[in-house]
Amino acid sequence: MKYFLILLFLNMIFTKNYNLSELINIALEKSPQIKLANEDKKISLSHSIEARSAALPRIQFVTSATRNYNVAGQPIDFPIPFGVLNPVTGDPIPTEWNPGLQETEIIPYETMFSMGRDYSGLYGININQTIFDGRVFAGIRASNKFKNLTNASYDSQKEEIIENTKISFYTVLLTKKVTEVFHKSLKRSKDNLFNTKLLYDSGKTNELELIRAESMVKDQETTYSNAKKNEILALEKLKLTIGFNLSQNLNIVGAFKDSIQIIPEFNEISNQLLAQQPRIKQLEANHDLLQEDVNSYLSEFLPSIELTGSIHKFQSQNKDNFTWKNFQDNSSLSINIGLPLFNGFGSTARIMRAKANAKKAYYHSEDLKNNLLLDLRNIHLSLIEANEKINAGNKKLELASRGYNIANDLFLTGMTTQLELLGAEVSLNRAELNLLQAKYEFQIALVKLSRAIGKNTTGNTK
C-alpha cells in the first residue's frame, strides 16, 4: 500500500501539462482516422507507380532446354532419277538406246526423314516497349488525379481531426471553468451559512433564515459534484478523441479567447473557402478523375503501337555436338500496330456512361459549394453573435458581482432577507455561466471557421 501511494504521488508530480498544439500533434499521430488516411496515400502512390510502369519498357530474361528421346519421322517422297534403280527390286534398268538410263519416267520413292536433334537450348532477352497507347497515357493522367483526390481526402480527415480535438479541448476547458464557478459559489454559501449562524446565535435573525442558508449549501454541494462529474467525462472524451491512453493522467492548460475587435468580412472568408476547402478540392479531383475515364474510353478508338525485340542464343545438336560454342545468334525486331474497327458499340456506351458520371460529380461539387457557403454564413453570424454576448456578459457579470456584494452587506446588517441574498447568488452564478458559455460559443465558432476555410491544411502539398 505504501509503494502504491508513493507511485501515485510521483505520478501526480510528474504528470505533464498539455496545451492545445501538443494535443493536436498527438491526435494527428495516434488517431485511427489519420492512420487510415496515411494508408490511402500509400495506395495512391502504388496506383501512380503502376500506371507509369505501363509506359516503361518490359524486359524479360528467357531460357529453355529440350531433350528429345524419340524424334518422330516425317514421310517425304524423293524422286528416283532416270536409269538409277528399279523402285521395286533396286536393280538398274537399262533402256534400248542407252543402257545407263531408265525406261520409265521419274518415280517418287517415299522415305522417313527425322527432323530434329537430341538436344536444343535457348537463352536471351525479350524487350517490349509501348510506343503509343491512349489507355496507357490516360491511366497515367488518372493516377495523378487520383493522387490529388487522395491528398484532398487526407486534408479533409486532418481538418476533421483538428476540429474535433479543439472542440473536445474547449469543452474540457468549459467544464473546468464551470467547476470553478460552482466551487466559488459553494464557498460563498458556506461563508453565508457561517455568518447566518452568528446572526442566529446573537438573535438578529430567525431559524428560517438559518434553514435557507443550510439548504443553499446542500444545493451548491450537489451542483458542484455534478460539475466535477461533467469535467471528468469531458476529459475522458478528449482522451478518446486524440487516441490518448485512458489509464494515464491528462492535464490541459489554456484559456478562452476574449472577443476580437475585427471579425473578417463574409466575402473574404467565402473566397478562402472556395479556394482552400479540402472537401471542395476532393470533389473537384473526383470530377477530374471521372473525366479521365471518358478520355480512357475515347482512346479505345485510337491505334496502339508496340515495339518488340529479342536477343537470343540458340542451338539444336545431337549429344556429342551440344556445347556452348555452338550457340548461335537469333535476334529479331518487330513493330505491332493495332487499329480498332468495330466492337459492337461497347466503347460508345462506356463513353456515354463515363460522361454522365462526370457530370454528376460536377453537379455534386457545385451543390456542396452552395451548402458550405450556407454553413459559413451560419458560422459567421454565430461568431458575431457570440462576440456581442461576450461584451454584454462582461457588463452583466460586473453588475451581478456588485449586486451580490450589496445584498450580502445588507443581509449582514439585517436590512434584507436570505431570499434576496439567494437571488443575488443565483444572478451571479448565471452571469458567470452565461459569460463562459458565450466565450465557449465564440471559440467553437472560430474552430468551425478554421475548418470551413481549410485554414489548418493551407499550403499542404504532401
Identify the function of each model-found stretch:
Residues 3-12:
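Sec-dependent N-terminal signal peptides
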Residues 14-73, 246-288, 340-341, 369, ...:
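Bacterial Sec-pathway N-terminal export signals of envelope proteins
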